[in-house]
């Protein structure tokens, strides 16, 4: 057996012992020689009887050569130089790829040179013998006639399969264009030729991919059209453009601060329409209020109630950011003062429909809270001016009598009732820092309220923001009378007015009372500026508008001190205004509002409590401040006289200093005080003076605001507060 196996290996046949025995049994001869076994093995498949002799990694590319002789069985032959459909093509030189096996390991040989005995017609199962050393490149055996010999042989089951596949390949494209066959190939640029060889009706019935319900029924279409028509009608009735899933003006409060402010009246109309039952003009089950449910859920998760969140989204076209800003603004706003029984609820003048200013501010949520431009910011710090103060209406002065009954007069329904404004308006709309919101406190007497600035400023605002023609008429008439005197608007006697006029003339001549003409030369006065009573300072807005220097000359300081003596003991409203009345509108949209009283209206520091009876937040500044001050009403009940020790509010830094009362005005509205620590004198309102024991009861300091003042020497002030971050204002119409 070993000799037989060795003899077969010399011939290149690697057969297993079982294979040799099988070949012996298949041979008809009793004594089988290696030649007989080879003849039998030629017609048998090597896979069951062959022994593995090819390297296992012959296909890995690491083998560079294969030494023969060895016999392999052809598995498949393919012409790789032609397409599979036309392997017999002679358009390109033939290159055969021969797949062979030793029964266990398969390898690939490539026709490196022309093989004369192997072709595409060589059937699988044919045995070939590799001779000598065959080169192997990248796992491919390089074959030529010198390296390979065809031994022949036929393996029946392999030949049958091969012939069957070849016959199928010849007939596979014969049914082109027929039913069930592939479509004919149409060259590019030519039209398709349709060959209807079958009945098209029968073919349509057999189409399984046809949609059975491609067209909706007429009833479905009618229902859809009805819903669509109802939805369009509903949108038309609501008179607003609905934006789904958010809104086109996200961050509007930053990118376009005036967008919501300009459409305030439109929002009011929309709100009133929403308050009506929507079921009146919508079809049931067809349309409903379109609120972004996701945005609504997000807002509710933050702790807001559903109704408020829903309304905010409706008001802002489902804009989540703007609606959230609106809700936060409402939550942070201070509560409005309770409305008294004898006083009807305040109306927003000039805007109709009973809207108060607070409602409008709430609706325009997300508006900036400070000046939007650098010019507006500087105006707010240096003082914003309006013409309204120089034209106090008769209606205002008729309601002012004295401190004792001013509270009742402020509630008189027949007189002027200023609407409550948003507490933050003084910061946002560049109000003069000393004249603030009219609220729960009574109006002052004629002495202290001839320049009741909150009322005047609000009048000016209404005038600039859509006040009625009557308002324009009254104010223009007052403007013509203002340069002459304010005394005509008071109910005081002619005698007192005449006396006041004489005193004023004396003061202008420099012959006023000596007690009011103290020069601030005996001590470092806290202010470096002129007193608020300086007529030049009162005319300063006009001076600036006329192009005059912002800072007066060196003689101005002395003249401003002399102005202390010019504070005649008449009502504040009777001071003759020096210079024409200005009606110049400011760049930020507010009318210039100026006053002629002793307290400067255009400095950024809060005034000496001249409107405390009129405004709960009169101490608020136009810039960022610490907070509103409580009014000092204790002065209404203190009978001040010359020589009394007190705490007096200094107008520039809004702080109380120890002072001595030098003289009290006959009207009981103002007094001249001498600051004990500095020696300079100031005329201040009585409601800005408090007893010494109140020193600890009230916070008199206002910090965190940067003050821009006119008429100074250009030098920085001592202990100047730091500036808070800048906040742009809300936009204006």
UniProtKB/Swiss-Prot annotation:
Cellular component GO terms, alphabetical? cytoplasm; nucleus
Composition bias (Basic residues) maps to 346-355
Whether Zinc counts among this entry's keywords is: no
Pfam families for this protein: RMI1_N_C (PF08585), TUDOR (PF00567), UBA_7 (PF22562)
Q: List the disulfide bonds.
A: none
Subcellular localization(s) per the UniProt record: Cytoplasm; Nucleus
On assembly, the entry states: Component of mRNA stress granules.
Summarizing the function annotation, the protein's role is: Scaffolding protein that specifically recognizes and binds dimethylarginine-containing proteins. Plays a role in the regulation of translation of target mRNAs by binding Arg/Gly-rich motifs (GAR) in dimethylarginine-containing proteins. In nucleus, acts as a coactivator: recognizes and binds asymmetric dimethylation on the core histone tails associated with transcriptional activation (H3R17me2a and H4R3me2a) and recruits proteins at these arginine-methylated loci. In cytoplasm, acts as an antiviral factor that participates in the assembly of stress granules together with G3BP1.
Q: What is this protein called?
A: Tudor domain-containing protein 3
Q: Which organism is it from?
A: Danio rerio (Zebrafish)
**Gene transcribed to yield this protein:** tdrd3
């Amino acid at each position: 057996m070993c000799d037989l196996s060795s003899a077969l290996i010399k011939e290149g046949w690697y057969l297993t012992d079982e294979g040799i025995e099988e070949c012996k049994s298949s041979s008809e001869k009793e004594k089988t020689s290696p030649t007989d076994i080879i003849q039998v093995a030629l017609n048998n498949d090597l896979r069951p009887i062959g022994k593995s002799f090819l390297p296992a990694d012959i296909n890995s590319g690491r083998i560079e050569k294969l030494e023969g002789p060895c016999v392999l069985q052809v598995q498949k032959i393919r012409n790789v130089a032609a397409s599979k459909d036309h392997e017999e093509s002679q358009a390109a030189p033939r290159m055969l790829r021969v797949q062979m096996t030793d029964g266990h390991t398969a390898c690939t040989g490539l026709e490196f040179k022309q093989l004369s005995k192997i072709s595409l017609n060589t059937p699988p199962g044919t045995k070939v013998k590799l001779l000598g050393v065959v080169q192997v490149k990248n796992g491919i055996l390089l074959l030529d006639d010198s390296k390979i010999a065809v031994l022949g042989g036929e393996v029946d089951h392999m030949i049958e399969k091969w012939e069957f596949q070849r016959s199928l390949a010849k007939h596979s494209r014969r049914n082109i264009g027929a039913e069930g066959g592939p479509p004919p190939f149409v060259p590019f640029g030519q039209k398709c030729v349709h060959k209807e060889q079958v009945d098209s009706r029968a073919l349509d019935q057999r189409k399984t991919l046809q949609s059975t319900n491609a067209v909706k029924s007429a009833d479905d279409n009618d229902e859809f059209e009805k819903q669509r028509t109802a939805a369009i009608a509903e949108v038309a009735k609501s008179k607003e453009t609905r934006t789904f899933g958010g809104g086109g003006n996200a961050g509007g409060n930053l990118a376009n601060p005036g967008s919501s402010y300009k459409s305030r009246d439109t929002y009011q109309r929309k709100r009133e329409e929403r308050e009506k039952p929507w079921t009146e003009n919508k079809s049931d089950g067809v349309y409903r209020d379109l609120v972004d449910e996701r945005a609504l859920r997000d807002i509710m998760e933050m702790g807001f109630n559903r109704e408020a969140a829903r309304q905010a989204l409706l008001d802002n076209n489902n804009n989540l950011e703007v609606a959230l800003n609106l809700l936060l603004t409402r939550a942070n706003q201070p509560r409005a003062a309770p409305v008294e029984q004898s006083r009807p609820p305040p109306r927003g003048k000039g805007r109709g429909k009973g809207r108060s200013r607070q409602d409008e501010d709430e609706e325009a949520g997300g508006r900036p809270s400070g000046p939007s431009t650098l010019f507006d910011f500087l105006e707010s710090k240096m003082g914003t001016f309006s013409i309204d103060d120089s034209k106090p209406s008769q209606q205002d002065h008729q309601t002012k009598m004295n401190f004792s009954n001013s509270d009742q007069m402020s509630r008189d329904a027949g007189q002027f009732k200023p609407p409550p404004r948003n507490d933050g308006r003084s910061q946002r709309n560049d109000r003069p820092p000393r004249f603030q919101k009219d609220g729960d406190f009574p109006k002052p007497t004629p002495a202290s309220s001839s320049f009741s600035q909150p009322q005047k400023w609000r009048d000016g605002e209404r005038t600039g923001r859509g006040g009625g023609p009557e308002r324009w008429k009254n104010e223009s008439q007052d403007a013509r009378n203002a340069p002459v005197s304010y005394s005509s608007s008071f109910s005081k006697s002619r005698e007192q007015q005449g006396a006041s006029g004489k005193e004023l003339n004396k003061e202008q001549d420099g012959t006023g009372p000596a007690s009011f003409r103290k020069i601030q030369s005996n001590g470092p006065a806290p202010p470096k500026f002129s007193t608020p009573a300086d007529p030049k300072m009162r005319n300063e807005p006009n001076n600036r508008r006329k192009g005059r220097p912002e800072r007066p000359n060196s003689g101005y300081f002395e003249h401003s001190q002399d102005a202390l003596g010019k504070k005649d003991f008449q009502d504040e409203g009777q001071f003759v205004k020096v210079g024409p009345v200005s009606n110049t509108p400011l760049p930020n949209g507010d009318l210039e509002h100026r006053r002629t009283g002793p307290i400067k209206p255009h400095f950024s520091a809060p005034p000496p409590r001249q409107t405390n009876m009129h405004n709960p937040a009169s101490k608020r500044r136009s810039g960022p401040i610490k907070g509103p001050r409580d009014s000092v009403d204790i002065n209404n009940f203190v009978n001040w006289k010359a020589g009394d020790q007190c705490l007096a509010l200094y107008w520039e830094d809004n702080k109380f200093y120890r002072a001595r009362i030098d003289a009290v005005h006959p009207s009981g509205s103002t007094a001249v005080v001498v600051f004990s620590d500095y020696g300079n004198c100031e005329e201040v309102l009585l409601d800005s003076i408090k007893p010494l024991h109140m020193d600890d009861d009230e916070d008199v300091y206002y910090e965190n605001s940067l003050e821009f003042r006119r008429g100074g020497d250009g030098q920085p002030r001592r202990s100047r507060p730091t500036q808070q971050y800048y906040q742009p204002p809300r936009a204006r119409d």
